[in-house]
């Protein structure tokens, strides 16, 4: 562990002591194996149940040994000591740092099984459907060996199938699907309609991706309601505007500003006197802003693709199509109009929850990732989670070459192609990590012009993902991919069957090339980690240009001088240090955004807990009827002839409708407040303090408003043996609902809504 001495000092002594204790327990576990091997399956399973009875483990060493012996019997996989150590740290609630290819799937299953034997219900959270289904089926024999049940959740399952799956002791599911089920369950009016049954523990695969990169991505449940969609005329007029003449874009390409000339052109072609008129500020101006953002800032094959006449967003952190994501506030419709497609229906947000708040619902959370160390501060700050570093089973043999830095993007791109061609000429397999679909396809085209066969993995063909990755380590393979995080399939040298393993080892193993630095070193390391698996040789190399986004953004306002050679290469440690500085600046910016966003979101998360508790009481007791009868005794007396169960359910339907409606209105109000909160600084008010003041004030009256509204409805609505006829009062719940994730909005400033930009489209 000497290589991580700096890490333990930075983190404090507790993690170091835990690591030493874990290593000692794993060493002791080996002493139990011979005795346990002699037991039959029934006796072995019973021994584990005895050790974990009462919700705690009496002998950790023997317990780990039992899990290991069972793994070998059921899966043919004997865990390495490092894997057993990781299992122990997960059971004790840490995030474990395990390198790619070190066997996280088995570790997660062993930990889930151990926690299940302790009587805990476990959700094993993955980043996509494929991994959830694969891992549940792969690990099923181990889990069922101990008499525990296991199931998986996927997007295409209906409510009945989900309800049955959630009854299992261990449930594998994508984080978004689990979150959507939480939201749907917040609309039920009968307990038996709930699909989830609660869980005690979340084991999170790719923990840094879920807990850091996507922590503040809102999951949304929406119902039918028209939204802010740009009219066709506005889309056509905006399409005619010229950059730098009619509008300008800031250096980060996150904001677009109309010039006076552009505003005048819009007013003339739309036949209006001023975009500032009251009649246009909340309608035409919003639609112009949406259309302009869609036209100028969202680029096809970078931010989205078009497939089967639909706009599909690209998840930047995973490099694949995000089937369930869409942009908010009419921006989705604006992009569809820009592409000449049918414009999708708008909707009212009924409820929303961030991934960070979702994970906060679990009494215990732990996780695994190959890049936990780099996320230590965020995990500690936002989740109070500790990181345990698990040493590799074999020493790392990968060679990480120093960055090759070029003066211009064009010079860098030529050098990348030359390097790939050189490596390919030897037969060494090459994996190239790009940042978006457009870049991956342009690079593949350039390589094919050199008669180099290329496999491309990006958002357009992610259905072929597992096969492409599995063969990426074969002789002569060149694979060009977007973001590799969460791909879930190991790259084995010599191909999926490792038939040419020895020859690829002689060639130097897998060569990984990054076409640019990412916004954080952690993402760079996710790509690097694809080479050098399980002690294999490998190479990693990043190409950088002074035109790259991370350099331009992180070095904003700074100047640097360098002397490139004839090819544009800048061989200078000083410049490499400066590029590293630029990356650290962008990392700091991301952390600041996360901190600010969490400060705004946390109060709403706390208020959600109060709403949830109120909802639970209304669902599970006769409280709704009792409160309505107390406030309107005469009306209650009129209904005495009805069955008590009918009266109580009618009360629930009425009370829950108005509680849900008022909560939805509160979310909409606070979103509007947040979008304009930056204006408070002009009035010398602290924006965050003012936001909290408004949130507390508005929420204080929410419960009473919901009760008052419910009492009013109770007095007027028809209630008979069929229940409360809310539809007749115009109080029907939406006839259709759908779920989606709000994309990490490239356009948002202090808030989540594109509408916040309407004050900034004029300089």
UniProtKB/Swiss-Prot annotation:
What would be one Gene Ontology cellular-component term for the protein?
Answer: cell envelope Sec protein transport complex
Q: Where does this protein reside within or beyond the cell?
A: Cell membrane; Cytoplasm
List all membrane-crossing ranges.
none
**Which SUPFAM superfamilies does the UniProt entry name for this protein?**
Helical scaffold and wing domains of SecA, P-loop containing nucleoside triphosphate hydrolases, Pre-protein crosslinking domain of SecA
Could you tell me one molecular function GO term of this UniProt entry?
A: protein-exporting ATPase activity
Please name the CDD domains in this protein's record. DEXDc_SecA, SF2_C_secA
**Which UniProt keywords are present, listed alphabetically?**
ATP-binding, Cell membrane, Cytoplasm, Membrane, Nucleotide-binding, Protein transport, Translocase, Translocation, Transport
The UniProt entry's coiled-coil ranges are none
The source's superkingdom equals: Bacteria
**Catalysis: reaction(s):** ATP + H2O + cellular proteinSide 1 = ADP + phosphate + cellular proteinSide 2
Cystines in this chain: none
Q: Which GO terms describe its biological process?
A: intracellular protein transmembrane transport; protein import; protein targeting; protein transport by the Sec complex
Enzyme Commission (EC) number? 7.4.2.8
Q: How does it sit in the membrane?
A: Peripheral membrane protein
Q: Quaternary structure?
A: Monomer and homodimer. Part of the essential Sec protein translocation apparatus which comprises SecA, SecYEG and auxiliary proteins SecDF. Other proteins may also be involved.
Q: Give the family this protein belongs to, as stated in its UniProt record.
A: Belongs to the SecA family.
Name of the protein in question: Protein translocase subunit SecA 2
Q: Which organism is it from?
A: Corynebacterium glutamicum (strain R)
């Amino acid at each position: 562990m000497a290589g991580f001495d700096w890490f333990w000092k930075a983190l404090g002594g507790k993690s170091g002591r835990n690591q030493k204790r874990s290593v000692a327990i794993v060493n002791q576990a080996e002493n139990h194996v011979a005795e346990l091997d002699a037991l039959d399956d029934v006796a072995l399973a019973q021994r584990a149940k005895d050790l974990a009875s009462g919700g705690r483990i009496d002998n950790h060493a023997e317990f780990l040994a039992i899990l290991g012996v069972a793994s070998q019997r059921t899966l043919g996989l004997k865990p390495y000591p490092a894997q057993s150590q990781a299992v122990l740290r997960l059971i004790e609630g840490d995030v474990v740092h395990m390198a790619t290819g070190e066997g996280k799937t088995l570790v997660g299953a062993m930990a889930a099984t151990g926690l299940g034997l302790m009587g805990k219900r476990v959700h094993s959270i993955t980043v996509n459907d494929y991994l959830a289904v694969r891992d549940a089926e792969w690990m099923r024999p181990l889990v069922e060996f101990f008499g525990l049940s296991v199931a998986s959740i996927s997007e295409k399952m209906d409510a009945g199938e989900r309800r049955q799956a959630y009854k299992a002791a261990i449930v594998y599911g994508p984080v978004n699907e689990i979150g959507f089920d939480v939201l749907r369950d917040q609309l039920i009016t009968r307990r038996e309609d709930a699909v989830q049954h609660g869980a005690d523990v979340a084991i999170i695969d790719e923990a840094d991706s879920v807990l850091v990169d996507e922590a503040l991505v809102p999951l949304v449940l929406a119902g039918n309601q028209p939204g802010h969609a740009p009219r066709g005329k506005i889309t056509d007029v905006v399409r005619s505007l010229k950059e730098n003449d009619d509008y300008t874009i800031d250096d980060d390409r996150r904001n677009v500003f109309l010039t006076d000339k552009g505003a005048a052109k819009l007013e003339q072609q739309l036949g209006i006197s001023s975009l500032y008129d009251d009649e246009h500020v909340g309608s035409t101006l919003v639609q112009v802003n949406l259309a302009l953002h869609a036209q100028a800032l969202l680029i096809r094959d970078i931010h989205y693709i078009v497939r089967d006449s639909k706009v599909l967003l690209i998840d930047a952190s995973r490099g694949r199509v995000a089937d369930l994501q869409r942009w908010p506030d009419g921006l989705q419709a604006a992009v569809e109009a820009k592409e000449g497609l049918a414009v999708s229906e708008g909707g009212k947000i009924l409820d929303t929850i961030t991934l960070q708040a979702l994970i906060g619902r679990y009494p215990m959370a732990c996780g695994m990732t190959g890049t936990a160390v780099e996320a230590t501060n965020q995990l500690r700050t936002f989740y109070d989670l500790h990181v345990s570093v698990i040493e590799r089973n074999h020493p790392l043999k990968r060679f990480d070459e120093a960055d090759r830095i070029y003066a211009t993007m064009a010079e860098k791109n030529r050098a990348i192609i030359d390097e790939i061609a050189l490596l390919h000429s030897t037969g060494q397999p090459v994996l190239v990590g790009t940042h978006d679909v457009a870049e991956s396809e342009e690079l593949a085209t350039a390589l094919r012009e050199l008669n180099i066969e290329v496999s491309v993995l990006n958002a357009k063909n992610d259905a072929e993902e597992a096969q492409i990755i599995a063969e990426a380590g074969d002789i002569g393979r060149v694979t060009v991919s977007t973001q590799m995080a969460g791909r879930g399939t190991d790259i084995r040298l010599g191909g999926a069957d490792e038939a040419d393993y020895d020859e690829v080892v002689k060639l130097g193993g897998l060569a990984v090339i990054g076409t640019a630095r990412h916004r954080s070193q952690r993402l760079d390391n996710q790509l690097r980690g694809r080479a050098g698996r399980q002690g294999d040789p490998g190479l990693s190399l990043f190409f950088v240009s002074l035109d790259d986004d991370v350099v331009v953004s992180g070095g904003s306002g700074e100047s640097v001088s360098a002397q490139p050679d004839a090819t544009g290469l800048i061989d200078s440690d000083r410049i490499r240090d400066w590029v590293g500085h630029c990356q650290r600046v962008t990392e700091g910016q991301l952390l600041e955004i996360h901190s600010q966003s969490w400060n705004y979101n946390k109060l709403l998360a706390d208020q959600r807990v109060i709403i949830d508790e109120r909802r639970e009481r209304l669902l599970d007791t006769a409280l709704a009827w009792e409160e309505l009868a107390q406030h309107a005794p005469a009306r209650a007396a009129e209904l005495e002839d009805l069955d008590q169960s009918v009266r109580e359910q009618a009360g629930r339907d009425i009370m829950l409708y108005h509680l849900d409606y008022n909560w939805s209105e509160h979310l909409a109000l606070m979103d509007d407040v947040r979008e304009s909160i930056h204006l408070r600084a002009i009035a010398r008010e602290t924006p965050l303090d003012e936001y909290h003041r408004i949130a507390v004030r508005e929420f204080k009256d929410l419960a009473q408003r919901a009760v008052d509204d419910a009492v009013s409805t109770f007095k007027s609505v028809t209630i008979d043996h069929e229940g409360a006829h809310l539809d007749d009062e115009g109080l029907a719940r939406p006839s259709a609902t759908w779920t989606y994730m709000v994309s990490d909005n490239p356009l948002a400033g202090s808030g989540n809504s594109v509408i916040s930009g309407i004050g900034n489209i004029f300089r």
